Amino acid sequence: MGDSDRDSGGGQNGNNQNGQSSLSPREQDRFLPIANVSRIMKKALPANAKISKDAKETMQECVSEFISFVTGEASDKCQKEKRKTINGDDLLWAMTTLGFEDYVEPLKVYLQRFREIEGERTGLGRPQTGGEVGEHQRDAVGDGGGFYGGGGGMQYHQHHQFLHQQNHMYGATGGGSDSGGGAASGRTRT
């Protein structure tokens, strides 16, 4: 954050001059914990790279909004189908609908692998069918600290390494900078 932002008390996420959050508890619930966002960012960068507070806060807001955007679309689909549980397939459908189709194939592979690992971890020896989040999967994708911060599930480095091995890291599907997918598609949610 620049000096003028700091001096004026401005800045993202409502942090005041003392570095304390001035967001209400309700507003704070909208964002992923900044420590988790920072940890994920650091793992994607060289060991000696530094990340400014402003960059962390910006990324925190962006990823939180992205999650809300995709989840909202999946939720709308589930409501129309009179279902209460959003599953991984609903999220993939939402990403396609919203213009993030370049990410869907690597995520399908990841979701299948995640289900296989979860099946092995619970001793079932087989993945769950239907794609709904079961009791044993909540630690990894919902309650209990979230995907990157909680106990259970595939750890971040496995996830990161897996996507990198699939040669789809950061949407790199061979299309270069003008591959035309994702947020630059100009689509808005109605």
UniProtKB/Swiss-Prot annotation:
<dbReference type="InterPro" id="IPR003956">
    <property type="entry name" value="Transcrpt_fac_NFYB/HAP3_CS"/>
</dbReference>
<comment type="subunit">
    <text>Heterotrimeric transcription factor composed of three components, NF-YA, NF-YB and NF-YC. NF-YB and NF-YC must interact and dimerize for NF-YA association and DNA binding. Binds directly with DPB3-1.</text>
</comment>
<dbReference type="Pfam" id="PF00808">
    <property type="entry name" value="CBFD_NFYB_HMF"/>
</dbReference>
<protein>
    <recommendedName>
        <fullName>Nuclear transcription factor Y subunit B-2</fullName>
    </recommendedName>
</protein>
<keyword id="KW-0539">Nucleus</keyword>
<dbReference type="GO" id="GO:0009536">
    <property type="term" value="C:plastid"/>
</dbReference>
<dbReference type="InterPro" id="IPR003958">
    <property type="entry name" value="CBFA_NFYB_domain"/>
</dbReference>
<dbReference type="GO" id="GO:0003712">
    <property type="term" value="F:transcription coregulator activity"/>
</dbReference>
<dbReference type="GO" id="GO:0016602">
    <property type="term" value="C:CCAAT-binding factor complex"/>
</dbReference>
<feature type="DNA-binding region">
    <location>
        <begin position="32"/>
        <end position="38"/>
    </location>
</feature>
<dbReference type="InterPro" id="IPR027113">
    <property type="entry name" value="Transc_fact_NFYB/HAP3"/>
</dbReference>
<dbReference type="GO" id="GO:0003700">
    <property type="term" value="F:DNA-binding transcription factor activity"/>
</dbReference>
<dbReference type="GO" id="GO:0048574">
    <property type="term" value="P:long-day photoperiodism, flowering"/>
</dbReference>
<dbReference type="GO" id="GO:0009414">
    <property type="term" value="P:response to water deprivation"/>
</dbReference>
<dbReference type="GO" id="GO:0001228">
    <property type="term" value="F:DNA-binding transcription activator activity, RNA polymerase II-specific"/>
</dbReference>
<dbReference type="GO" id="GO:0000976">
    <property type="term" value="F:transcription cis-regulatory region binding"/>
</dbReference>
<keyword id="KW-0010">Activator</keyword>
<keyword id="KW-0805">Transcription regulation</keyword>
<comment type="function">
    <text>Component of the NF-Y/HAP transcription factor complex. The NF-Y complex stimulates the transcription of various genes by recognizing and binding to a CCAAT motif in promoters.</text>
</comment>
<feature type="compositionally biased region" description="Gly residues">
    <location>
        <begin position="172"/>
        <end position="184"/>
    </location>
</feature>
<feature type="region of interest" description="Disordered">
    <location>
        <begin position="168"/>
        <end position="190"/>
    </location>
</feature>
<keyword id="KW-0804">Transcription</keyword>
<comment type="similarity">
    <text>Belongs to the NFYB/HAP3 subunit family.</text>
</comment>
<keyword id="KW-0238">DNA-binding</keyword>
<dbReference type="GO" id="GO:0046982">
    <property type="term" value="F:protein heterodimerization activity"/>
</dbReference>
<feature type="region of interest" description="Disordered">
    <location>
        <begin position="1"/>
        <end position="30"/>
    </location>
</feature>
<feature type="region of interest" description="Subunit association domain (SAD)">
    <location>
        <begin position="59"/>
        <end position="70"/>
    </location>
</feature>
<dbReference type="InterPro" id="IPR009072">
    <property type="entry name" value="Histone-fold"/>
</dbReference>
